[in-house]
Amino acid sequence: MAAPNRDPPGYRYAAAMVPTGSLLSTIEVASHRRLFDFFSRVRSDANSLYDVEFDALLGSYCNTLSLVRFLELGLSVACVCTKFPELAYMNEGRVQFEVHQPLIARDGPHPIEQPTHNYMTKIIDRRALNAAFSLATEAIALLTGEALDGTGIGAHRQLRAIQQLARNVQAVLGAFERGTADQMLHVLLEKAPPLALLLPMQRYLDNGRLATRVARATLVAELKRSFCETSFFLGKAGHRREAVEAWLVDLTTATQPSVAVPRLTHADTRGRPVDGVLVTTAPIKQRLLQSFLKVEDTEADVPVTYGEMVLNGANLVTALVMGKAVRSLDDVGRHLLEMQEEQLDLNRQTLDELESAPQTTRVRADLVSIGEKLVFLEALEKRIYAATNVPYPLVGAMDLTFVLPLGLFNPVMERFAAHAGDLVPAPGHPDPRAFPPRQLFFWGKDRQVLRLSLEHAIGTVCHPSLMNVDAAVGGLNRDPVEAANPYGAYVAAPAGPAADMQQLFLNAWGQRLAHGRVRWVAEGQMTPEQFMQPDNANLALELHPAFDFFVGVADVELPGGDVPPAGPGEIQATWRVVNGNLPLALCPAAFRDARGLELGVGRHAMAPATIAAVRGAFDDRNYPAVFYLLQAAIHGSEHVFCALARLVVQCITSYWNNTRCAAFVNDYSLVSYVVTYLGGDLPEECMAVYRDLVAHVEALAQLVDDFTLTGPELGGQAQAELNHLMRDPALLPPLVWDCDALMRRAALDRHRDCRVSAGGHDPVYAAACNVATADFNRNDGQLLHNTQARAADAADDRPHRGADWTVHHKIYYYVMVPAFSRGRCCTAGVRFDRVYATLQNMVVPEIAPGEECPSDPVTDPAHPLHPANLVANTVNAMFHNGRVVVDGPAMLTLQVLAHNMAERTTALLCSAAPDAGANTASTTNMRIFDGALHAGILLMAPQHLDHTIQNGDYFYPLPVHALFAGADHVANAPNFPPALRDLSRQVPLVPPALGANYFSSIRQPVVQHVRESAAGENALTYALMAGYFKISPVALHHQLKTGLHPGFGFTVVRQDRFVTENVLFSERASEAYFLGQLQVARHETGGGVNFTLTQPRANVDLGVGYTAVVATATVRNPVTDMGNLPQNFYLGRGAPPLLDNAAAVYLRNAVVAGNRLGPAQPVPVFGCAQVPRRAGMDHGQDAVCEFIATPVSTDVNYFRRPCNPRGRAAGGVYAGDKEGDVTALMYDHGQSDPSRAFAATANPWASQRFSYGDLLYNGAYHLNGASPVLSPCFKFFTSADIAAKHRCLERLIVETGSAVSTATAASDVQFKRPPGCRELVEDPCGLFQEAYPLTCASDPALLRSARNGEAHARETHFAQYLVYDASPLKGLAL
């Protein structure tokens, strides 16, 4: 047995140093002494004696002092602390409250109400605190005196061991002190809903609204508005004292008082009770004290009391009592450990002490007045959490997603300037603010002005995923598709002579055309607003900027028969080839004209005289018909033209003198020959017209090179051929005289699968044809290839001229001619037998040798045009009727036609696969079909009203393309069905044997643009050239790198993280805090003893409503740089690659080389490429910008308020209660967008199922590696995530509403923070399915005006736009 010894005088040294003078300090001193006195009494080897008493006293020591320290904190205001020794044995605890519902006595016929008592049951939430320390074996020996040898060194070592034990115990005590505060702070945060949620919910219920769909929608709108207004309010308020005070009043009055009425609570020195506690961070506390709040008192009277949960063994009645005073450690040992008295005596003494005067002490406190409440202002950041590894719970993080509109185009009513003198360009320069915007300016972190341009989207669109539409086609064809009018979606194989092709088409398709609606024509006449309407049945097929989706004929290989077979339809997709084929509603004519105006700056422009002369010729209904005959007879032959030069000069000069218009401008071959050979023979003003036309064609051709980067050939084609349609040999000019274009086309790579059908036959090239060999009824594939003067032994199977000859022809016919004719001209076949017969039928009087050639057709009978020589059906009469003066020698040159003739017009149908820059697994089987006429001509202004002209005898209208299908020409052809006359003015009647709209390289939007354009000829030519740039990953790389607007804009999405500082308010005595018996576990080790201290704790809310609330006060700092780092899909996105390996490697290297997110080298064999680490970082973690393709016609106002980046609202908060409403809300565009009832969507390329944006960012497809970690767009597109957020928000609203409503005992209502509050605070954009606009502008001058805070800063200036910040950060300076 151990014998007690006297207390050594040094054992109480540490306790004696504790300052005294208050009750709390007295308790601490007594506890120290009692613990250390133990070591003076015990001297024994019996571990049992040592264990029992030491463990008990150690537990009591930590238990008591941790509670004592906690009572000094402001958090204790919100707590009712209760000792519950049996807490460790409790399996489930419940507390029942009885709440009386207040009544109002009223007069009148109202029924008399009886008192109502509501019973509420709450479950006790169990927790625990743990700490540990260890004592070495040597230290234990010194503490017990076993190792003392009577020397001074031994005594010193014992003293050091005691001090080390004191430090260990003090560390455990500190851990329990801080742990108690941290645990209670977490308890209060767990039951504190955000202020942004609680305020709308209170208004929602206070107004007596019911939980209907209307009320729910109103509530959500109020919730979103409240979140933006109340978040970071302290940071946004600046020095506005009234605003901050009102915000604090809202914060402190949003909660409900506790049902507990403690006998004693915190009070100021004058006895006024404290109403609650406001816990925040040290900077916010300091700012509130300095600038906004009045300190009512600097000290508070704190109760040193606790309650005790007493369990009577007889009846197990649970009672909650208050007022047990902690006076000494002996009381703790008697009451808490039950070591000396029976339970009955303890209960009796507890009840007796309830009547004694409770003990209080005075502590340092900041008591402030907020409204009518006295609040304990507390900041625990430095006091509790300093130098610990535990983060301060009131310092959180919030992810905000921002949306920026890039490259959009203002509608006509928004393109204005407030004052004519503002933001004017330099003198003599055009105003660049009238051009379509290609960049966006905004502020990043530290108010740094950053720029986003279309070039930044290279990492997104210059990727093979742009061409991946297999999933879309497969998904659309899951359900049966109703057959539609196949016109424009069906290509027939040409058969028979060209002269019969148009009539056969009208006969076979007449019924379908008369009764069927042609979708692609109707779409061209829609405004952007009409196109986006829910009643647009075809909106569901507008899914991708690079592809047309349409209802085609199922199971038919094209080209097919004359008419499509009857049967079901199927959704098909074709590559749009060029950006000009984007629907006019999504890429308006005004945008195209503005882009053309921009491209024309600094480049060649045709003179006004040239424009007037050429336009006059195209509009001249009295254009001499004989010119068409001469054009057909020359048939593009340089040799024939030179032979007829005298006649041509006289024709051009005579027409110029009569009308000041230029002749033969409908044939580029003749225009080029005139410039080459007739320079000195024509009047200078007239010659200038032709030279100007050729110069402009060459300038347009140069435009392609200006927007093409240098690079290797891919798939056997130069980069310019992959970038621009006019340079692509696969496209033929609509009218060809020679076979150069066909030969170059046939020489393309085999993967292009270029095929040509010449009237249903394979083409055969013939060198020459004369009157002896000509067969005008030929019906085979022979094509004439002798348009250039050449040697007799020249080969017939290779081109005669350079590639530019064909390119210039295409530019002239597809660009210049539409700009002048505006779609009113028409291609036509030639009846060469009649043409030659008429041209050879002439009367030319013989002129005697030595006589001069007669020059006066009126008086000189020897002149061919003298009335005496005007015989019917002769060419003389035709020249006379056209007022063209020619002489006899000139007419005699027509005799040369017998030696070089053309036989017939041949209809050509050409097909080709996509080029190497667009050829993927999805597109490799797609074919583009284009028609052309060999040996055809172009008819200009219609002349059907002039009965002296019978063009039908020589030509037959045969539209080869919608650009050359003038309604007056087609409808006034012989045997045209009268029922189709009105239709012909709307629908271009092009035979399916010459192509179809959806399979053509140039489609209806280009035709409609030509008709609607208000631009002049110069701007329109550049606009059309810009529209012929291709839409493919390789082509877009050239365009975006060189600064060309691709015809569509982008919605830029960026997510940033912000470190936030929060404020917590809790009502007085709103939480019951149960403290169980602290248990000490002892674990023997080889080197000593480990002690683990565990104390079970529990808590339960004491309110019938929310008794705590939290608010985000300000931003401490942004974690991300708020920058402009563009996404790069080559870092990990998977997609079917380009089939041409060289093109795939070139594109990858080109994109990665210019991207800050380029993968590090070497690329790993497995897994994603890694992002290289840069040498330094200044503004924070890089925030990645992702790009969603968006039509340029999208209303910029959509982005001026919080919006869904998809272009359509999502999330079930808007949805009804029926099954499937959530999905219909997202994808059923037959219903309007709930957030914008006047439209179905703002971006059909992203909001619809299987759309381009959906395929890119929807993780459900697992196609392109969309990641919730790496992609800020993922949460807006993935339906599973959206549904989860919907359920979260729905549950948040339902549970918040039920919690603050009348509660019964039917359920255990805890008044905890509702599920979803974490998402509301940390990721509100995902919860609301909305991103916030930032202050940004397409013009830096507009951005500066917003920064300077101009009173009436305009939001638009011509084509430029400014978007103001509408996020919760509005008003913060970051």
UniProtKB/Swiss-Prot annotation:
One GO molecular-function entry: structural molecule activity
* InterPro entries registered for this protein in UniProt: Herpes_MCP, Herpes_MCP_upper_sf
Pfam families, alphabetized = Herpes_MCP (PF03122)
SUPFAM superfamilies, A to Z: Major capsid protein VP5
One cellular component (GO) term of this entry: T=16 icosahedral viral capsid
Please give the family membership noted in the entry: Belongs to the herpesviridae major capsid protein family.
Q: Quote the function comment for this protein.
A: Self-assembles to form an icosahedral capsid with a T=16 symmetry, about 200 nm in diameter, and consisting of 150 hexons and 12 pentons (total of 162 capsomers). Hexons form the edges and faces of the capsid and are each composed of six MCP molecules. In contrast, one penton is found at each of the 12 vertices. Eleven of the pentons are MCP pentamers, while the last vertex is occupied by the portal complex.
Protein name per the record: Major capsid protein
Gene from which the chain derives: MCP
